[in-house]
Amino acid sequence: MKKLVTGLLALSLFLAACGQDSDQQKDSNKEKDDKAKTEQQDKKTNDSSKDKKDNKDDSKDVNKDNKDNSANDNQQQSNSNATNNDQNQTNNNQSNSGQTTNNQKSSYVAPYYGQNAAPVARQIYPFNGNKSQALQQLPNFQTALNAANNEANKFGNGHKVYNDYSIEEHNGNYKYVFSFKDPNVNGKYSIVTVDYTGQAMVTDPNYQQ
């Protein structure tokens, strides 16, 4: 009887020990599973963070490329505008140049003498040279005449009347020579020269014929 009781007790202890080992094994396996899940979750979190960082870096690169492209577009547009402005300026200059040339041609006045002109300038400075060559070097006749008249009016009577002109040549350089009659004094003239630069100068304000 004692042996039976002792056997049952030993069996109970063995089963209890086996159950405890099984529980410990389960706990150990559970801890391993939990640890593996935690590591997997941490890895996913790290991978997700890395993906977000990579996406952010990619986004920065895309934004940088967009900015670079925008800067290039702006530079190209600026260069295009500058080219168009230069072309427009060139066209305007050519147009103005053509207009000036046309105005000069249309305002050209051939040399002439005054009404009932006496041979005064022609007598003082007779010219026998190449008139066409001289006129090519000299300024516009009407412009030179106006400048000479203004200069003559600075001396004595301020309303002198144009009489005649001639051309003087010296070492290949030419000058207009104008005579202006003083309407208040019979036979009195002012002699004025205008050189190839357009500079007017009175050489004799009281020439008497």
Curated annotation (Swiss-Prot):
Lipidation (N-palmitoyl cysteine): 18
PROSITE patterns hit by this protein: PROKAR_LIPOPROTEIN (PS51257)
Residues with a covalently attached lipid (S-diacylglycerol cysteine): 18
Location within or outside the cell: Cell membrane
Compositional bias annotation for Basic and acidic residues: 23-70
Record keywords: Cell membrane, Lipoprotein, Membrane, Palmitate, Signal
Extent of Low complexity compositional bias: 71-106
Signal peptide (UniProt feature, chain positions): 1-17
Membrane topology, as annotated: Lipid-anchor
Stretches the record annotates as Disordered: 17-106
GO cellular component, one term: plasma membrane
Protein name, entry field: Uncharacterized lipoprotein SAR2457
Organism of origin: Staphylococcus aureus (strain MRSA252)
